[in-house]
């Protein structure tokens, strides 16, 4: 079988049998793929520590007859993101970003935008402590890449301008609701004027905008609750990594 080279981030690594490992990668070339690393646990000589989550690597893979899994023949580390691995908060945020990326895309569908966003977010975590604004920017960017962006600049139900806020937010309706539509929707979430403005800046400016966006409480809490609800609505559940962030999140604002 012909071998091809892929550049990807390890989203998940699962032990298989006594000595093997199955890794899920988000790649620049093929989107999300899974690969079988034979003997990865028996000897570190072949793969070293390259198959750990959040590693950016270059991989040589091949198709395997009768299997959806690629065969992983060799890897080299492009970026190990070693600094983020020494801090629980950064690990938790990286784990959440990786799980979110894994759940939002289907196999073998190229997602250049999401791949580049994930690498940029891991770079930010490697460079310094987690910032709530950066995580919100990652969530918004990931939703954009998946075609699921919430409506924030106008009412998600009727399309009327919502102005500068405050507004109500509903995941099922698709985003912000104007004063006329909100009363007819139960259990909406509040978005103060400052929260709405911050989310719009992050939606437009991405991770670059997050560097100058404090997103301090209570805006940080409102933004987190709104995007968490929106993601849960589309994914059908709360991600395991999000639940872990909920446990340690008060220390991070994440």
Curated annotation (Swiss-Prot):
UniProt record, GO biological process: DNA recombination; double-strand break repair
Keywords: DNA damage, DNA recombination, DNA repair
GO cellular-component term (any): bacterial nucleoid
Disulfide bonds: none
Any Pfam family: RecO_N
Family named by the database record: Belongs to the RecO family.
Stored PANTHER family: DNA REPAIR PROTEIN RECO (PTHR33991:SF1)
Role description: Involved in DNA repair and RecF pathway recombination.
Protein name as catalogued: DNA repair protein RecO
Organism whose genome encodes this protein: Anaeromyxobacter sp. (strain K)
Gene name tied to this protein: recO
């Amino acid at each position: 079988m012909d071998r091809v080279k892929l550049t990807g981030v390890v989203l998940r690594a699962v032990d298989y049998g006594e000595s093997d490992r199955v890794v899920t990668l988000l790649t620049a070339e093929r989107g999300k793929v899974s690969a079988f690393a034979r003997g990865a646990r028996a000897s570190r000589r072949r793969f070293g520590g390259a198959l750990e989550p959040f590693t950016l690597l270059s991989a040589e893979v091949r198709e395997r007859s009768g299997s959806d899994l690629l065969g992983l023949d060799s890897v080299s580390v492009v970026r190990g993101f070693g600094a983020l691995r020494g801090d629980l908060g950064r690990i938790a945020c990286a784990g959440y970003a990786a799980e979110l990326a894994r759940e939002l895309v289907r196999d073998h569908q190229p997602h250049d935008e999401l791949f580049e966003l994930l690498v940029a977010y891991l770079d930010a975590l490697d460079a310094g402590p987690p910032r709530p604004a950066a995580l919100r920017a990652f969530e918004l960017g990931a939703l954009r890449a998946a075609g699921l962006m919430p409506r924030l600049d106008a009412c998600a139900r009727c399309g009327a301008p919502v102005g500068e806020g405050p507004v109500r937010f509903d995941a099922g309706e698709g985003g912000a609701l104007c004063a006329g539509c909100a009363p007819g929707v139960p259990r909406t979430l509040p978005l103060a004027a400052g929260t709405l403005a911050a989310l719009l800046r992050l939606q437009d400016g991405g991770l670059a905008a997050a560097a100058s966006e404090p997103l301090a409480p209570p805006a940080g809490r409102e933004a987190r609750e709104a995007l968490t609800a929106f993601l849960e609505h589309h994914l059908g559940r709360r991600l395991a990594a999000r639940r872990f962030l909920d446990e340690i999140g008060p220390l991070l604002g994440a």
